């Protein structure tokens, strides 16, 4: 028994040291990485995000009415900020703009387009609210509504209270304007 203890004790004392001196290689990653975008799009691959309860980040964009719209200047009003992949996504909102105004909500649309095109679309289709030109996708990206790989806005919307705080956020799906109106009405009416 004494001989067994003499052999086992040195083995137990040396095994932790032996395990620690063993070279360990880091696990290999199985993730494939796509080539990194370049130019302005490199900065847009890291999407921001805005959560319910956050103060909406300020921005300044040119509207379809050829004026600069600063989000922080809209404080005092409820704001529905709608992001669409292309300008055709705004046509459905013309039907609810009057109802939104009746409950004290200002509608602002954002898409990745230029101001001149948005002005032409507004005049041609009689769009009664301001569409904001996010030509580079920078603002959409800051809000988490930009797909850098496809270089387009992700559909969704935010409802901002009079202090600019996000009260409702929906991202990644096209919601019919009538349902957006209902959700916005419920949000504005909530205590």
Where on the chain are the PLM-derived regions?
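Bacterial N-terminal signal peptides
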Residues: 5-15
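N-terminal "domain-start" segment that seeds a small globular fold
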Residues: 23-71
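Short active-site neighborhood of thiol/selenol oxidoreductases, capturing the structured segment around
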Residues: 69-93
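Residue-level structural signal for beta-strand termini and adjacent loop
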Residues: 72-74, 145, 172
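Structural microenvironment flanking redox-active thiols in thiol-disulfide oxidoreductases
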Residues: 87-130, 137-141
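Structural micro-motif
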Residues: 128-129, 145-158
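Thiol-/selenol-based redox modules, centered on thioredoxin-like
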Residues: 153-191
